[in-house]
Amino acid sequence: MMENEQSVIGIQYGDVDGDYKCEKIILMGIPYEEGSSFMSEVELIVHYMDDAKFKFKIDFSGYAINLFLGDFLQEGYDQILITGQSGGNGNYVLTRLYKFEQNRLKLVIDDEDLSNLLQYQTFYQNDGQIGVQSLATGAVFTLNVRGRRLTSPGYNPMPQPFSPPSVSTINTIYPIKQPYSNYYTLQLQQRIIGEVNADILGMMQTVIELTQLVPVIQSQAIVQFS
């Protein structure tokens, strides 16, 4: 069986080392099969205009991998954001944010760090409402599920499930820039699900700032699904 060859996942141009010059950033990977969006053995290449190259093996594999350059740390030059999806039932987001300094890649944050920050406790409130509390900030958000059946007939004959809905790990991630801002933040979304993954009741949406020594939650909101 012939092994699949490396394919280009993405190419971006930007100043990633603060020298005020543009570098070419290339992300490569090996597809599972021809035409597949699942990539493994990911490699990042920093290509200088004088033809010098630095290559790095990235411990990363997944679907729909994307490369993005932007200043997340408010340092005046770009960092390297790699995102993808795990696929499968949960289909959670995969994330690596790197900075390039002294010809080396330094990991700033990954999906595990973000997931550890965005933990929640859910509980029933009165009159058909569910409380969703952020363990990081203590803020409580309310989800109205009045009149909505939270369980399938085969799971639980009681009118209320034994345990409240849960908040999934991070499902989507977007780099965003606020008006009049000179740096990027990360917008993250997590599904609020009932007894099965297909029962999506709502979504937690969080914006995280990375300009401090630790990631800071800038804002959080709950999105109600009808």
Put a short name on every predicted segment:
Residues 1-226:
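Beta-propeller-forming repeat regions
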